[in-house]
Amino acid sequence: MATKKIRCALIGSGNIGTDLIYKLKRSAVLEPVWMVGIDAASEGLQRARDLGLKTTAEGVDGLLPHVKADGIQIAFDATSAYVHPENSRKLNALGVLMVDLTPAAVGPLCVPPVNLREHAAKLEMNVNMISCAGQATIPIVYAVSRVQPVDYAEIVASLASKSIGPGTRANLDEFTYTTSDALVRVGGARRGKALAVINPAEPPMIMRNTINCLTDDEPQQARIIDSVLSMIEEVQQYVPGYKLVNGPVFDGRRVSVFMQVAGLGDYLPTYAGNLDIMTAAACRTAEMFAEEILAGTLQLTPVKEAA
């Protein structure tokens, strides 16, 4: 007998939404059923249809009448920070759990190897995946801050222009605020700053991340190295292309780590590791919730609107 899977909807038919189809198709506990877009001619919707998903070009409102009939329990929002709160409200009201891949940060911020278990233990109906830069760098900042206090963390993510769609470009300010905030709230630094560089080079460059942490005291080098290497292994469990290029390098109280992220090449080529780390983290997060739902330990409940 086939294992029961939790049925999912994907909102947003751009780079991230389309890549997610492939990730969910491989999942043992998730099944992509619907793809929601706003442009009937979009490549993402066409590809979703070719892969056997139901589609609508009428936005979330086109999905709502089908949620109950098709048993949708988890939705992934890969649209924009501007429309996410409304999408979330409409679907939460029907008892659908939202995994938010926009920088809206309506719900708690989630980085799987750092705090996923904590979120699965609480009944949360919206979790936010921060940003691709956040998913790539916060594990490293946390790996340092769990050894000793970090006064300041600064990250620079260099992303291939071809991998950045119109949705991400429209959200660059939110991307910066949400990622900077998450370096503190999830990464454990006292202060944080995130910068994104969109690189137009041809052929496209692989995603690269530079992480700098300023510790309060002299860095405990051996412990930091062990902590960082073990964290990298944890991330590699769901993003195999997550790789240490150099570091940790110590210079006074500064700890620097240089990472690169290659994608699996599901939808965009492997240089778009920023897509992969985002979709893989979202998939890993949804799987954790799906396992709890299937085990009967998590009951999704419709969210009533505040009066």
UniProtKB/Swiss-Prot annotation:
NAD(+) binds at residues 13-16, 163-171, 274. One of its GO terms (molecular function) is acetaldehyde dehydrogenase (acetylating) activity. SMART domains: Semialdhyde_dh. It comes from the Bacteria. It catalyses: acetaldehyde + NAD(+) + CoA = acetyl-CoA + NADH + H(+). The keyword Oxidoreductase applies. InterPro entries: Acetaldehyde_dehydrogenase, Acetylaldehyde_DH_C, NAD(P)-bd_dom_sf, Semialdehyde_DH_NAD-bd. The active site is at residue 132. Its EC number is 1.2.1.10. It holds the Pfam family AcetDehyd-dimer. It is an enzyme of class 1 (oxidoreductase). GO terms for biological process: catabolic process. Keywords: Aromatic hydrocarbons catabolism, NAD, Oxidoreductase. NCBIfam families: ac_ald_DH_ac (TIGR03215), PRK08300.1 (NF006157). Belongs to the acetaldehyde dehydrogenase family. HAMAP family: Ac_ald_DH_ac. This is Acetaldehyde dehydrogenase 2. It comes from Methylibium petroleiphilum (strain ATCC BAA-1232 / LMG 22953 / PM1).
